Amino acid sequence: MSYDRAITVFSPDGHLFQVEYAQEAIKKGSTAVGVRGRDIVVLGVEKKSVAKLQDERTVRKICALDDNVCMAFAGLTADARIVINRARVECQSHRLTVEDSVTVEYITRYIASLKQRYTQSNGRRPFGISALIVGFDFDGTPRLYQTDPSGTYHAWKANAIGRGAKSVREFLEKNYTDEAIETDDLTIKLVIKALLEVVQSGGKNIELAVMRRDQPLKILNPEEIEEYVAEIEKEKEENEKKKQKKAS
C-alpha cells in the first residue's frame, strides 16, 4: 500500500507522510522570526525579491487577525490565506458572542484545531504552513505561539520558522536574555540580528512588524529598518575595534 498517498492512514512505523510533506513545504518558505519582549512583541520575515512590475505591498507574510493579535507564516501563501480568513471570522464571532476580543491562546488553539482536522479528513490535505502568532492578553501580557501542519501548538519566548529556522533558532538560543529584550528597541534589534543570520542583502529584504499593548499593529517602513541595520553594523564595528585593542 502507498502510505504517502492516503492522508488518514499511518505507515507501519507510525508516520503520517502527508503531514511530514507539509512540514517539508514550510522548510522551503521564507524565514520568519518572533520575539516576545517585556512590553512588545516583534515579528520579522525574510522578504523574497519580487518581479520588477509587481506591487510588493500585495506580498505580505505578516497580517493582523484582530486588534490585539497578529501572525506571520512560512509555507504556501494560498494555504495561509484560508487559515487567516477563518481565524479573522472566528475573532469577529467571538467578539460578537462575548463582547470581548480573543486571547492569543484561544485563537492559536482554534488555528491548531483547524489544521488538525485537515490531517484526518478524506478528500483534503494538510495546510502547508507554520505560523507564529503574537499579541497581548487582557492583562497586557505579551504572548508568542507557534503552530505546525500537524495541529500542535506551543508557547515560546522566541522562535523561528521557514528555511533558515535552524540557524536563526541557534542564534536566538545564544542571544535571547533578559538584557537583550530590556527595551523595545533592543527587542527589535534582536529580531533584525536574527534575520541577518540568513538574509544577505541587509534591511531591504526584511519585513518587520511590532505590536504594543493597546496599540494597533505597526509595519515598519524600509527607512526605519535600515536605520536599525545601520546601528547594528556600527555596534559590530565598535565591538571589533575593542577586540583588536584587547588583542594588541
From Swiss-Prot:
Top-level lineage group: Eukaryota
Modified residues (Phosphotyrosine): 153
Classification via Gene3D superfamilies: Glutamine Phosphoribosylpyrophosphate, subunit 1, domain 1
Protein name: Proteasome subunit alpha type-7
Cellular component GO terms held in the UniProt record: cytoplasm; nucleus; proteasome core complex; proteasome core complex, alpha-subunit complex
Keyword list, A-Z: Cytoplasm, Glycoprotein, Nucleus, Phosphoprotein, Proteasome
Organism expressing this protein natively: Pongo abelii
Cell compartment(s), UniProt: Cytoplasm; Nucleus
InterPro entries: Ntn_hydrolases_N, Proteasome_alpha, Proteasome_alpha-type, Proteasome_asu_N, Proteasome_sua/b
Pfam family, one: Proteasome
Function description: Component of the 20S core proteasome complex involved in the proteolytic degradation of most intracellular proteins. This complex plays numerous essential roles within the cell by associating with different regulatory particles. Associated with two 19S regulatory particles, forms the 26S proteasome and thus participates in the ATP-dependent degradation of ubiquitinated proteins.
Keyword Cytoplasm listed: yes
UniProt gene name: PSMA7
UniProt subunit comment: The 26S proteasome consists of a 20S proteasome core and two 19S regulatory subunits. The 20S proteasome core is a barrel-shaped complex made of 28 subunits that are arranged in four stacked rings. The two outer rings are each formed by seven alpha subunits, and the two inner rings are formed by seven beta subunits. The proteolytic activity is exerted by three beta-subunits PSMB5, PSMB6 and PSMB7. PSMA7 interacts directly with the PSMG1-PSMG2 heterodimer which promotes 20S proteasome assembly. Interacts with HIF1A. Interacts with RAB7A. Interacts with PRKN. Interacts with ABL1 and ABL2.
Family stated for the protein in its record: Belongs to the peptidase T1A family.
BP-aspect Gene Ontology terms: ubiquitin-dependent protein catabolic process
Record: glycosylation sites: 130
